[in-house]
Design a protein with these regions (language model features):
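Short, compact, well-ordered microdomains
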Residues: 71-112
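Generic serine detector
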Residues: 2-3, 24, 34-35, 40, ...
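Generic, low-specificity signal for short hydrophobic/alpha-helical stretches with a mild N-terminal bias
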Residues: 3, 12, 68, 80-82
């Protein structure tokens, strides 16, 4: 997992705040960090999500929560390892569709109806 230092914490957002911003009209942007592959009818890869505004001047990466790691208070970016996990998260946010980029570097944007 990628980690973000405390001085970068303003660039991240928790799930609760993410949900609030989605309901206020912000967009969820899914980024594929590692190309997906299919194994036994399951798509595996690495995806991260950030919340953005329409003109892309506001961007924050989704994080699960703060956790203690060694002596440092560290924040980890939430990574989705399967397309099913990603789709389940988007559905729990209220999205009625999911467009999952399968190639590394691919991006898709989601909004609430």
């Amino acid at each position: 997992m990628s980690s973000i230092q405390d001085n970068e914490a303003p660039n991240v957002i928790t799930e609760t705040r993410f949900r609030t911003l989605m309901q206020s009209g912000y967009l969820a942007e899914v980024y594929c960090q590692s190309s997906a592959f299919n194994k036994s009818a399951v798509w595996y890869g690495v995806w991260v999500i950030r919340i953005i505004d329409e003109d892309r001047t506001f961007m924050k990466l989704l994080v699960p929560a703060r956790s203690m790691s060694d002596k440092h208070d560290e924040i980890r970016i939430r990574e989705f390892k399967t397309a099913n996990g990603l789709i389940s998260f988007l559905a729990s946010m209220g999205c009625t569709h999911a467009n999952v980029p399968l190639q590394e570097g691919g991006v898709s944007t989601h909004s609430l109806p």
